[in-house]
């Protein structure tokens, strides 16, 4: 809720419903996700998130604002999860089929693989990122990660230590990396609002392909947030043991 660029962004409404609820409903359509936990901070600014969760009977965990890694570990411990899917709340267009695809690829790997992601190298639209990792990997990272960046962003420790976590990159057969469907600034909200309002009239459970189709039918929409600058990535693409197209 304390976002500097767009305060309160996850509770902004489209079709009279908070974006966070839109996302949770979409994630709940995953065939593999068994439990959803909203992991927010103890910052009083996030009290509204707690109210939202209680109203909707949604599982909630509150932890450190800056040490998000410890917050995730606390949420995992409380939920009893052994395999964890990390999604950020600024991605209201999360696609359950993409989530399931990453989970499936992760589960197909040998036990040595403790982390899978479709985020690096970027081939999916920004806003459809999925990270899947073991509880064991999370506990190791929480115990050993010392850099502030690693603790704030949860998974960089995995990227820094590929020889220990054997990260798997799940890559789309078509490169959609120029698509931006994440929520950081007001212009992002304008685009997401247009997409949701248009597609909700056609189908409730719209997928990535539906978003691509409606953007192709309305090419000017992409210009709405084309000026937004993405935060540079710290981790390079060449750390992965391999890429799995799909």
Model-based region annotation:
Residues 68-73, 89-105:
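Acidic donor-binding/catalytic loop of UDP-sugar-dependent glycosyltransferases
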Residues 79, 95-123:
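Conserved donor-nucleotide/metal-binding helix-loop-beta segment in metal-dependent transferases, i.e.
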Residues 81, 130-142, 186-190:
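Conserved nucleotide-sugar donor-binding
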Residues 84-85:
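Short aromatic/hydrophobic "clamp" motif used to bind/position activated sugar donors
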Residues 133, 154-246:
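Conserved alpha/beta core of the MobA/IspD/sugar-nucleotide pyrophosphorylase nucleotidyltransferase superfamily
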Residues 1-40:
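N-terminal glycine-rich phosphate-binding loop and ensuing alpha1 helix
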